[in-house]
């Protein structure tokens, strides 16, 4: 195979130096294609009853695992960059670039599911017996992705056993799992980063106090407007709706209420990190907050795409084996997979819910000159 980027396009150039071991590794050697392309062992073939679609099944899942490896590689580098007291603008730009790369990979993985769906349930049944006790639940790399992202052990849906039990006595796998659980996750590091958002300082701009004041004024104006409603029933409905909104805001302004929601699993961020996320959302048009806002958006994209991938997987499993059969690894199959679509598996849940706490643009506290100067010279 010729590479158009490594030649002038003339494959018969007499002056060209032939590729050899003296020049360096050739394409196949560099990519170790002899190992990669020889790693498809069809069990149906070994049983002398070859099933054509088993090859597709193997290739698709191997492709998933290769992309999982790249996602882990990107996550590890991003975690290293975030694990610092100060993150300058250059690093933030690189983090955004690598998160965007993960987003594009996940889009590719979501689009890969329909290829597997070209196989009919009957085709799958022809070789499904060879898969047991293998199961997608045993994908070590996907578990590492979840842990490095920030899926908490206590948030996981259990099916008859702890999620690590499927790795048995595989010391290498168990060590990798423990290391991913003990190391700071992307969620933890993003939380620390948000807690340092400039403008949260009580002896400085004190965004949180100004935001509370703006919310109080906004709700007071809403009450005043509702009181002018001529129809009593409509007025009472509007006042009731305003009180509900007041309770929603109370859940972020009262630290005790927020901490209770975190303990219950309904929120992920610390109280101060949530403040930072809200501030970045409000002032995303400010140059200093532009990249941080992109970063938060990409984290939501990653969560969304993983959920989409899970959903596509659930639908495919239901099409292939129905909703009553057990999975090949002994899990509850469709029922278990469907349970992973809940918010408990959404790592950056708080970012999705930020829109709940928005106020009209004109009510957002204006930045004063002091904080503007600070944002010019301070990295987030």
UniProtKB/Swiss-Prot annotation:
- What GO molecular function annotation could you give as one example from this UniProt entry? tryptophan 2,3-dioxygenase activity
> How is the subunit organization of this protein annotated in UniProt?
Homotetramer. Dimer of dimers.
Q: Which Pfam families would you find in this protein's record?
A: Trp_dioxygenase
Binding, substrate: 57-61, 128, 328
**Source species:** Drosophila mojavensis (Fruit fly)
User: Is Iron found in the keyword set?
Assistant: yes
Q: Which cofactor does it need?
A: heme
* Chain's role: Heme-dependent dioxygenase that catalyzes the oxidative cleavage of the L-tryptophan (L-Trp) pyrrole ring and converts L-tryptophan to N-formyl-L-kynurenine. Catalyzes the oxidative cleavage of the indole moiety.
Q: What is this protein called?
A: Tryptophan 2,3-dioxygenase
Which PANTHER family does the annotation name? TRYPTOPHAN 2,3-DIOXYGENASE
């Amino acid at each position: 195979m010729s590479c158009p980027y490594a030649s002038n396009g003339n494959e018969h150039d007499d002056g060209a130096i032939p590729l050899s071991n003296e020049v360096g590794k050739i394409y196949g050697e560099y990519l170790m294609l002899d190992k990669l392309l020889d790693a498809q062992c069809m069990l149906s073939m070994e049983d002398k009853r070859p099933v054509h679609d088993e090859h597709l099944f193997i290739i698709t899942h191997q492709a998933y695992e290769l992309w999982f490896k790249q996602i882990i590689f990107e996550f590890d580098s991003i975690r290293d960059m975030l694990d610092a007291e100060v993150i300058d603008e250059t690093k933030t730009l690189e983090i955004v670039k690598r998160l965007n790369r993960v987003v594009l990979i996940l889009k590719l993985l979501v689009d890969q599911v329909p290829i597997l769906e070209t196989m009919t349930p009957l085709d799958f049944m022809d070789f499904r017996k060879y898969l047991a006790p293998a199961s997608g639940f045993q994908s070590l790399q996907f578990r590492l992705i979840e842990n490095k992202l920030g899926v908490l052990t206590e948030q996981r849906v259990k099916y008859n056993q702890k999620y690590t039990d499927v790795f048995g006595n595989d010391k290498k796998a168990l060590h990798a799992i423990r290391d991913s659980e003990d190391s700071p996750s992307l969620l933890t590091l993003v939380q620390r980063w948000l807690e340092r958002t400039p403008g949260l300082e009580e002896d400085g701009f004190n965004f949180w106090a100004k935001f509370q004041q703006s919310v109080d004024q906004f709700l007071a104006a809403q009450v005043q407007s509702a009181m002018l409603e001529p129809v009593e029933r409509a007025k009472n409905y509007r006042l009731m709706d305003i009180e509900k909104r007041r309770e929603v805001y109370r859940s972020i302004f009262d630290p005790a209420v927020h901490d209770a929601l975190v303990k219950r699993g309904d929120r992920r961020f610390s109280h101060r990190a949530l403040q930072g996320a809200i501030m970045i959302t409000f002032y995303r048009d400010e140059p200093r907050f532009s990249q941080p806002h992109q970063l938060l958006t990409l984290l939501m994209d990653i969560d969304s795409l993983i959920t989409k991938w899970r959903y596509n997987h659930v639908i495919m499993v239901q099409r292939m084996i129905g909703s009553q059969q057990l999975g090949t690894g002994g899990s509850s199959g469709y029922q278990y997979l469907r349970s992973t679509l809940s918010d408990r598996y959404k790592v950056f849940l708080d970012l999705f819910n930020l829109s709940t706490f928005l106020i009209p643009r004109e009510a957002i506290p204006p930045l004063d000159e002091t904080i503007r100067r600070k944002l010019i010279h301070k990295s987030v």
